[in-house]
Every structure is written in structure tokens, then in C-alpha cells.
């Protein structure tokens, strides 16, 4: 579907192109949305760059202030978002060597670790406490330390529990994991690597708490191995002797790009970057059941509502936050993933031209700020900060005005008003089928018989304004 694009919005050269625009009637500041408000936007021109890529976040432990670490083609930008409606661009750490499309950032304690595919870049180390007192921003920062154990890298992963970084896609270990001890951040030390499963494009490393008792407390590396079209699961507890556990493949593979564990480490959600364009189906998220790490199995394939390519995705609680290129940020409810139920519950689309299977739009999102603000890094659109409409002040009254109970429910669902009159109610299932709808109610309480509904997730919309998720037992 062709989307309306307000090109006039791009002529702003000030830092704040727009600020706090609620999502009303599917639009916020000229961007299509569902359930997510636009808090702020900074175009790429402000950062003096032509492209953005990866991103991460840091929260200052001293005062709780939140900062965005934004990857650019020519360096890394730092943005203070402690006032989300008025973010402050503090400055940039220039690239260590040349410019490149690819840059990746992670944090450990109060330090940022930055890699790039620029030749000879190595790993930049930056003390984030420099962001506390910046006079006359934006300024140009300098790195505090440098690691030259590899020339360049596609990505970096950090297990903050152990103090180890894992650079992947380097010129070492066949492009597999390159281990670095960063427990003393300004004095990183090479600690070995793993090459048996080939080049890794991206990875996640966790201290394992999942259902496989054989690996309880172990440090588990799960690599998405790009053109190798496999997932590689490795026990990296002993850095001098990492042990391959298993590999797995799947049908219609093109480029095994990136994935993330559910918080209980049972499931792994994977995105393949080429499958949408190669095969022609809608955005596919592949779910693997890793109950037994030695014998992982494909559990479920979820297909989105557009043909856009998926890029990076992250799990936080019951939600999966997906950077979906031309389709923007998509938020999926995975609370019922065990029963093969995944449903999109919201989105914010920063790319206006289309939802095609192209590489335009959102490269990365960062959903882990305690404030619940979500950073979106758009390749050409720049920095966006969004927030769930249910969390913003303008919606608090709606959230508190209506109560939906019991939840979970068995046979009957009650919607009760604590103020506003209930004028309309609709209930839809996870595929959008309307199972109940009434309008012109003008009542303060409504009981609905749901005994015929199948067990699963449903969405109750009240007055075409507030939507609440309910579970039918």
C-alpha cells in the first residue's frame, strides 16, 4: 500500500523535527502507526552523515539518565533522552578509520565497545561517563582505548554477566567468534575464539537459565551464520576450549541474519534477511524450541502482515521488538509462543514510501530503557523515539476508565466503566477476525458471553480508542 509521505517535514534542519505527537487515526507526525506515539525525531542532517545503522542504549547508574548510542556511517552519535520530548545530541565519536555502512555497538559497565567493517577499524572503547557533563553540544569525542586484535568486524556481542565480548565476522577465526576479556574495559585482552561453524553474522551470548539441565549456568553462544544458513550453538564457558553443541538449519533459507532468546531461554526467534525477497512471502520469524540444546527443533513460523524484510529483533518480557526495514518497528506479542501463537500488537513505520522487501527503513531498534521509550534507527530517516500510547499521559485516563475482567476468562467477560460511557465494543482474534461487535451501547457495564471462543489470545477494543489483550482459557 502506498503511504502518504509529508515531504515538507524533511526540510527542518533543527535538532527536533517533531516532538511528542500522539498516534491518532493511524498517524503520528505523518508516519503510520498503531499503538505507538512519536516522542521525538532527529534527521540525519543534524549528525552530518548520509546513513545510520545499528544502535544501543546506556543508562547512567548514578542518576538514571538514559542515552542512545547511535551508529552512523562515519561514527557513533550520543543522544541524551532523559527528556524524551527534547532529546539532546551531545556529540559524535568519529570512525577509527574509514566510513562504512556497517557499525555495531554494545556496552559493558560504563563503557561502549564499537566495531565496524571499515578496514583496520578494530574496536573502539569509549567511557560513557564523558556524557555526564557536555558543554556546548554537539562536541567531537575521542576514544579512551583501542583493541587491535582484529582488523574489522561486522558485529559485537557482550555477555555483561561475565565481562566477555565476542566480535563476529572478523578477519580472525574464519569469521567466527573472537573472544575478548573486557573485565578491565580499558585494557582488553584476547581470549581465544571459535571457528568450527564458519563465519558468524550476528550472535547472542547468555548465561544459560533454560530448561536443558545439562547446561545450567553455562555461557552459551548462539550464532546466526549468514550465508552458512545455519544457527550455531556453542558452550563458551571455557574460553580456551569452547565446545560446539549443535547446529540447525531450516527450509527456504537465504541469509541467517539475527535472532534472540526468549527470557526463559527456551525459544529462539530468528530472522532470515533474504527469504522474503528470494521466496516472496511476508515477513517471516522462525521460532526454534531449544528445550534440548543438543537437539533443537523448529517449532513455528510466524508470517507478518507485510512483505518487508526483517532485520534485528529483541525480546523484552512478552514482546518481540522487530526492526522490519520498510515496515518500521513491529511489536509482536509472544506470551503464547508455547502454543504457536504470535500476534502483532503495534507498530511505528518510519519509512513512508512502501512496505516492500527492500533495504530501506529501520536497521535497528532498542527497547530496553526502563522508561519504556524505544529508540528506532532508520537508515535514511535518522533517530526516532517512540513510546506505547498506553504509557503516555494523554492515555492514562482511558486506561484507568475501563476495566476488563476476569483475565484470563472462561465463559464471560465483563467490561466496566469507571467514568466514561461505553459506546462500542469489538473483540477480534489473533488473525483479525471480528468475533463480537456492538455499537450505540451507552452503558457503564457490559457482560459478553465468550464460552464459544477457542482458547487463546483476543483483543477487546473499547470506543474505538482503547485496546486490551485478554486470554480465553
Sequence positions of predicted segments:
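C-terminal tail/sorting-segment detector
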Residues: 3, 457-473
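Short, surface-exposed loop/turn motifs with a glycine/proline- and acidic-biased composition
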Residues: 419-420, 439-464
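Residue-level detector of functionally pivotal "anchor" positions at catalytic/ligand-binding pockets or at interdomain
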Residues: 386-405, 411, 418-420, 433
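Short, glycine-anchored, charge-dense loop/turn motifs used at functional sites
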Residues: 427-435, 458
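Short coil/turn motif common to extracellular beta-sandwich-like domains
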Residues: 216-218, 407-414
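Sec-dependent signal peptide recognition
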Residues: 2-11
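Feature marking well-ordered beta-strand scaffolds used for ligand recognition
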Residues: 19-391
Amino acid at each position: 500500500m502506498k503511504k502518504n509521505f509529508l515531504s515538507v517535514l524533511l526540510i527542518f534542519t533543527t535538532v527536533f523535527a517533531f516532538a511528542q505527537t500522539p498516534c491518532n487515526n493511524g498517524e503520528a507526525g505523518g508516519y503510520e502507526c498503531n499503538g505507538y506515539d512519536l516522542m521525538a525525531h532527529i534527521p540525519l542532517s543534524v549528525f552530518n552523515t548520509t546513513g545510520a545503522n545499528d544502535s544501543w542504549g546506556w543508562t547512567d547508574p548514578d542518576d538514571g539518565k538514559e542515552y542512545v548510542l547511535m551508529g552512523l556511517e562515519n561514527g557513533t552519535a550520543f543522544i541524551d533522552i532523559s527528556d524524551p520530548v527534547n532529546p539532546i545530541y551531545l556529540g559524535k565519536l568519529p570512525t577509527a578509520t574509514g566510513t562504512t555502512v556497517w557499525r555495531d555497538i554494545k556496552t559493558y559497565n560504563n563503557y561502549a565497545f564499537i566495531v565496524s567493517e571499515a578496514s583496520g577499524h578494530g574496536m573502539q572503547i569509549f567511557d560513557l561517563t564523558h556524557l555526564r557533563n557536555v558543554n556546548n553540544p554537539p562536541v567531537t569525542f575521542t576514544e579512551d582505548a583501542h583493541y587491535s586484535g582484529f582488523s574489522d568486524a561486522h558485529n559485537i556481542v557482550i555477555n555483561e554477566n561475565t565481562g566477555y565480548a565476542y566480535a563476529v565476522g572478523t578477519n580472525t577465526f574464519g569469521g567466527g567468534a573472537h573472544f575478548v576479556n573486557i573485565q578491565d574495559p580499558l585494557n582488553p585482552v584476547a581470549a581465544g575464539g571459535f571457528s568450527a561453524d564458519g563465519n558468524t553474522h550476528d550472535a547472542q551470548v547468555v548465561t544459560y537459565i533454560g530448561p536443558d539441565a545439562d547446561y545450567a549456568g553455562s555461557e552459551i553462544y548462539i550464532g546466526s551464520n549468514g550465508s552458512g544458513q545455519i544457527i550455531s550453538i556453542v558452550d563458551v564457558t571455557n574460553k580456551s576450549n569452547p565446545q560446539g553443541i549443535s547446529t540447525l538449519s531450516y527450509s527456504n533459507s537465504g541469509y541467517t541474519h539475527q535472532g534472540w532468546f526468549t527470557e526463559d531461554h527456551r525459544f529462539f526467534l530468528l530472522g532470515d534477511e533474504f527469504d522474503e525477497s528470494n521466496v516472496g512471502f511476508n515477513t517471516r520469524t522462525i521460532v526454534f524450541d531449544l528445550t534440548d540444546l543438543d537437539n533443537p527443533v523448529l517449532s513455528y513460523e510466524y508470517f507478518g502482515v507485510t512483505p518487508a524484510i526483517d532485520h534485528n529483533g529483541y525480546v523484552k518480557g512478552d514482546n518481540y521488538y522487530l526492526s522490519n526495514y520498510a515496515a518500521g518497528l513491529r511489536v509482536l506479542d509472544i506470551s503464547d509462543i508455547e502454543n504457536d501463537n504470535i500476534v502483532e500488537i503495534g507498530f511505528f513505520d518510519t519509512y513512508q514510501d512502501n512496505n516492500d522487501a527492500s533495504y530501506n527503513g529501520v536497521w535497528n531498534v532498542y527497547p530496553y530503557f526502563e522508561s519504556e521509550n524505544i529508540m528506532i534507527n532508520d537508515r535514511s530517516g535518522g533517530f526516532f523515539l517512540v513510546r506505547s500510547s498506553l504509557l503516555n499521559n494523554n492515555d492514562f485516563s482511558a486506561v484507568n476508565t475501563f476495566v476488563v475482567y476476569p483475565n484470563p476468562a472462561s465463559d464471560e467477560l465483563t467490561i466496566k466503566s469507571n467514568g466514561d460511557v461505553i459506546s462500542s465494543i469489538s473483540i477480534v482474534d489473533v488473525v483479525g477476525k471480528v468475533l463480537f461487535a456492538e455499537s450505540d451501547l451507552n452503558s457503564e457495564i457490559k457482560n459478553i458471553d465468550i464460552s464459544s471462543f477457542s482458547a487463546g489470545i483476543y483483543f477487546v477494543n473499547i470506543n474505538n480508542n482503547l485496546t486490551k489483550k485478554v486470554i480465553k482459557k
